């Protein structure tokens, strides 16, 4: 089964075990009125036959898939929505001064807790242990002060790492910073550390859009102004930086002891790889020009190849011949 969203209002489930891909189910967000628009941006997450996905309408859905096989051995689904959680509240709307509270990232799940973020800067934790009974109470709530497109990153200890944009330039953005570590076990004072990513020339060219990559005691974050940062996860100290070009929206990827990141967005796009033999001091091992356009999507690596979509509308595979 393939699960994906679209800009035509629909989140789809498509079967790949037929002679050709076959749509089995779709949910139209226009039938679930929310607060912004009806796109689906994040990747669905599935835990024990339940799919969790937030939409740009600002609503998080928990959907029981009821997966099974028909008499011919083909997969089938009979989904039912268990819970819908609105990602906004009156306090958030008053604080940000607008109604942009869409969910544009994927969720993070650990030990029965689900975390999601939205464009109003809200970081929300839900207890999903009773979701099949229609319950998903809010157990954590933090306002970061600005738009969050990056997915929350969670470590083995339950700490959250959040990358935040810089668009509204509210006072809260100065208080909180743009790359932060949160401890949900301290709901009244969860901010552990923060790193500021200030604007360069305009009020909106600071912050971070890309989801950080969590390594061995180091968080790697690509920023909108064009810096790649290596941050100590314990202290928040910036250990190392490198220039990767403005508009760095593609999320870095760690694979086989290397960090892979899209670079040079305004110069035709490209990829760069760093050795993480010393996690605190990445060493560039190769740099490849793409030339086809800016890469904003996150690459996938499989069988020695890099697969990624580009802003020029093409899907690419890079690797040795």
Report residues per predicted region.
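Extracytoplasmic/lumenal domain signature
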Residues: 1-41, 45-321
């Amino acid at each position: 089964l393939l699960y994906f969203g679209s800009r035509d209002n629909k989140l789809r489930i498509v079967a790949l075990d037929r002679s050709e891909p076959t749509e089995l189910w779709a949910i139209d967000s226009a039938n679930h009125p929310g607060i912004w628009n009806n796109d689906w941006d994040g990747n669905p997450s599935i835990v024990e036959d339940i799919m969790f996905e937030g939409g740009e309408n600002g609503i998080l859905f928990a959907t029981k898939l009821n997966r099974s096989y028909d008499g011919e051995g083909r997969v089938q689904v009979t989904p039912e929505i268990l819970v819908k959680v609105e990602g906004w509240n009156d306090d958030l709307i008053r604080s940000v001064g607008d109604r942009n509270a869409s969910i544009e990232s994927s969720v993070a799940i650990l030990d029965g807790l689900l975390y999601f973020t939205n464009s109003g800067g809200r970081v929300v934790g839900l207890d999903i242990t009773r979701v099949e009974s229609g319950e998903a109470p809010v157990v954590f709530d933090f306002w970061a002060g600005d738009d969050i497109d990056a997915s929350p990153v969670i470590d083995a200890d339950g700490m959250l790492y959040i990358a935040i944009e810089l668009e509204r330039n509210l006072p809260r953005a100065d208080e909180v910073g743009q790359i932060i570590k949160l401890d949900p076990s301290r709901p009244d004072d969860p901010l552990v550390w923060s790193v500021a990513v200030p604007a360069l020339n305009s009020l909106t060219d600071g912050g971070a859009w890309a989801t950080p990559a969590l390594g061995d005691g180091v968080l790697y974050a690509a920023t909108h102004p064009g810096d790649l940062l290596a941050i100590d996860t314990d202290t928040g100290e910036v250990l190392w930086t490198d220039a990767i070009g403005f508009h760095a929206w593609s999320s870095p990827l760690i694979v086989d002891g290397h960090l892979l990141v899209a670079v040079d967005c305004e110069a035709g796009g490209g990829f760069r790889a760093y050795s993480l033999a010393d996690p605190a001091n990445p060493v560039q091992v190769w740099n490849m020009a793409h030339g086809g356009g800016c890469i904003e999507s996150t690459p996938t690596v499989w069988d020695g190849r890099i697969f990624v979509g580009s802003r020029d509308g093409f899907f690419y595979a890079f690797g040795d011949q």
